[in-house]
């Protein structure tokens, strides 16, 4: 932002059909990275390759065939009913006029996410969890190879957090797409992710499977928190114990 560098030397590769989570403390660059990938923010340099194609050089319409984006649940941008909100996701394929096939695609994702009953409801009147499902559905009908999600569980209670994360994990498997999400909750990231990228002050500190990234050492280094990390069903579980005073944020 302005003259300050938010991201520095960020490089990573992701295998297809994986659920990847970007974690880190406030200000680490998680959401900025997601927004740079989707070109909401313009990076000063570098490239973003999907199937060896650089999306930074594509038109918005062409890019939308490769990348879809789910904003935070607190963003309320659609003054329409749920069906029409989701139909907007077909824009890269249909222009402004939809066909019967496009409407069938909408009904398909409504059924997939079990929200058919909400089809004619006003988007702005839905609960936070329902809105998040609709935004995920909108991204799915876009039929992009990579789905980006910015804090998909923010402002949701624990039941709806699990509901949304289960949907994302199931969609990655069923649709064979890649999901990249910024997330605050380390336990959710550990339980659901195939791969985790841990950031601090705009740099990648660790990247790999949950067992190699979610460690007591990394949590102390990145979050300045002493934590006990235990294994449950071969996944790390984090129990924060105390803050580490005096260390630099």
Predicted regions and their residues:
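The feature captures the beta-strand-to-loop junction immediately N-terminal to the Walker
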Residues: 23-25
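Helix-to-loop junction immediately C-terminal to a conserved catalytic motif
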Residues: 38
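Conserved ABC transporter NBD signature motif
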Residues: 46-54, 63
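Conserved ABC ATPase "signature" region
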Residues: 87, 101-118, 143
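Conserved ABC ATPase signature
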Residues: 122-126, 130
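Catalytic Walker B motif of ABC-type/P-loop ATPase nucleotide-binding domains
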Residues: 147-151
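ABC ATPase nucleotide-binding domains
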Residues: 222-249
